[in-house]
């Protein structure tokens, strides 16, 4: 499984990458905004996207429909610190939601 991490905070990207790689999951890349995200997919592939709901240049509710149209097989899991976002994320087309406060093992499940 190839995973792409999209988060504007370098420390969050590094922590997620470390947790995933310790479990033998291949992190194909990481990006900090939606422009980088869309550019990355022009030359790369991923099976799963861990997407920060609040990227600085385009929120998840706008970027998920674009990704769904271009990459229908891509699984999208939204990361956010607010539980209220769960309903919005699923309505926008996300496959799942993980709170940034959840234990890392929850992400792996």
Model-derived features: positions:
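Acidic, metal-coordinating helix/loop segments flanking the phosphotransfer/catalytic sites
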Residues: 30-48
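The feature encodes the CheY-like receiver
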Residues: 56
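Short amphipathic alpha-helix used as the core "switch/output" element in two-component signaling
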Residues: 61-72
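Conserved acidic carboxylate
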Residues: 7, 80
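Two-component/phosphorelay signaling modules centered on CheY-like receiver
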Residues: 10-29
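Alpha4 helix (beta4-alpha4-beta5 surface) of REC/receiver domains from two-component response regulators
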Residues: 62, 81-98, 102-106
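Acidic catalytic/metal-coordinating carboxylates
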Residues: 33, 59-62
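Active-site residues of response regulator receiver
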Residues: 52-53
């Amino acid at each position: 499984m190839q995973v792409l991490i999209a988060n504007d905070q370098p420390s969050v990207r590094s922590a997620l990458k470390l947790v995933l790689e310790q479990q033998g999951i291949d992190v194909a890349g990481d990006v900090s905004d939606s422009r980088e995200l869309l550019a990355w997919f022009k030359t790369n592939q991923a099976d799963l996207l861990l997407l920060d709901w609040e990227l600085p240049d385009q929120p998840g509710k706008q970027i998920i429909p674009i990704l769904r149209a271009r990459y229908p097989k891509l699984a999208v899991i939204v990361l956010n610190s607010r539980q209220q976002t769960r309903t919005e994320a699923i309505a926008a087309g996300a496959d799942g939601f993980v709170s940034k406060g959840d234990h890392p093992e929850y992400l792996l499940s």
